[in-house]
Amino acid sequence: TARIKDLTTGELLPDVIPGTLSSLIWVAGDTGIVYSLANEQWRTDNARLHWLGKPVEEDIELYHEDDEGFRVGSGLSANEQWLVLSTSDHETSEVRLIPAADPLAPPILVKARQTGVEYEVDEREGTLYILANDTHENFRLATAPLGDPGSWTTLIEGSDSFYLLGVDLFRDFYVVEGRLAGLDQVQVRYYD
């Protein structure tokens, strides 16, 4: 069960969301919350939107996953401009983006799921940064324009010796995390 507290006054708001099994993601200028409910198998198969001050019965389902083997997760892009809805099982993933300022806007599907392909997405200044295992089991880092999210261009090739674990985007640079010969590595790289 999720409850909301006003940290400036210490007051608990009347909003109570029972059955949540996820983090709460603030959207729409902190007037809405995206969350997931647990289904009968204790999996998150949905992403829902709750407007503060409205009854929970009026919450809107933003996404529902029909495949019982997949779980739904939500988060924000590093710049907090995009709600990132991901659905995945142990070997396959699919990501949709929704403007965080307008969570009722139609979602943008980055790439339709393909069995065995896992990917995650972040966005900076109209460019998507995609960590994916579509061309190499140790993942690659690709980019794509937000307006054409399926057109991936490799930025860092997949490698037998370097396992890409993650990428974090910042204003002036990005950080690549990985393993080289079993040792953790962090690389700071600049855009352009």
Predicted regions and their residues:
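Peripheral, non-catalytic segments that deliver or gate enzyme domains
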Residues: 1-192
